[in-house]
Each structure stands twice: as structure tokens, then as C-alpha cells.
């Protein structure tokens, strides 16, 4: 079994300086206590498609020991008007930081189910990025051990504040 931390114990952020930029210091951001996905129908979006992460998740011991590729696609819902008007990264969400945070989170933690990995990732993003109103995460497992040829197995979840 891996010596990786469980999500409940995760409070430390690791990574490059790039991965720390843009988190929680967005001057124009206002956290919204609760929204629904109906509220986000016309919201602005940051889209990250096909982020590849090598991590150790799975029900079978071999998956945890050897690791495998996961492919993450994200939609972050936020008000990006100020970023567009002022051409300022400080008024937006740094997608480079988001990518590094997702990569670090999935490498740092071990889950049996990709449903749990997606849920933990969604909650981490909502905590670290106060201007994110909601998130859609698609987490694919292209090397899923099902014994048949397939392109990928995965889950897609949506979470809001």
C-alpha cells in the first residue's frame, strides 16, 4: 500500500511557484455562498481538457503499486468579466495553477474509486479558488483493468458552492 496521505489529512499545497499563483488573491473575486447549476447556465467558463496525470488509484493492489494514467478535463465556472476588461491575470483564475494543483492533488492522495478521486478534486478546487462558483470534472481511466479493449472508463461530476 502507498504511503500517500488520505484526503482528510491534506492541508499542505506543494508544487512550483506557478502552482501557487492566483489562489485566493483575486482582488475582484467574491465568494458566493450557494449557487445551483441552473444559475451557471450563462456563467463564464475556464476549460481545461485532457490533463494527463500519472497516479496510484484503484481497487486492485496492482493499480496502487504500479500506478496508471488518468485524464482530467475541467470546466470552472466563474465571473471572468473583470479579467477580460482589465486584461489582468489577478482578476482571473490561473489555469496553469489549477493544472498543477489537480496534478499534485491526484498524485498526493490514493483513492480506490475514481468517483472519490473526482469528488476530492472538486472539493479541493472549490476550497482553493474562492472565485470558482462551480466545477465540472471528467476523470477518465484509459488503462482501466476490465480485460477488454476500450478507449477509457470514467466519471463526470458537477459541484457548486
Annotated model-derived regions:
Residues 2-161:
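N-terminal, polar/charged subdomain of small-to-medium soluble alpha/beta proteins
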Amino acid at each position: 500500500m502507498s504511503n500517500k496521505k488520505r484526503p482528510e489529512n491534506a492541508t499542505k499545497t506543494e508544487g512550483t511557484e506557478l502552482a501557487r499563483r492566483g489562489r485566493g488573491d483575486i482582488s475582484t473575486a467574491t465568494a458566493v455562498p450557494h449557487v445551483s447549476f441552473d444559475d451557471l447556465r450563462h456563467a463564464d467558463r475556464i476549460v481545461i481538457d485532457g490533463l494527463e496525470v500519472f497516479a496510484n488509484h484503484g481497487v486492485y493492489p496492482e493499480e496502487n503499486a504500479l500506478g496508471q494514467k488518468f485524464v482530467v478535463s475541467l470546466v470552472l465556472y466563474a465571473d471572468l468579466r473583470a479579467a477580460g476588461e482589465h486584461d489582468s491575470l489577478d482578476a482571473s483564475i490561473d489555469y496553469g495553477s489549477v493544472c498543477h494543483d489537480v496534478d499534485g492533488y491526484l498524485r498526493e492522495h490514493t483513492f480506490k474509486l475514481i468517483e472519490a478521486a473526482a469528488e476530492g478534486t472538486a472539493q479541493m478546487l472549490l476550497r482553493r479558488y474562492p472565485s470558482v462558483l462551480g466545477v465540472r470534472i471528467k476523470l477518465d481511466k484509459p488503462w482501466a483493468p476490465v480485460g477488454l479493449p476500450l478507449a477509457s472508463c470514467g466519471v463526470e461530476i458537477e459541484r457548486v458552492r
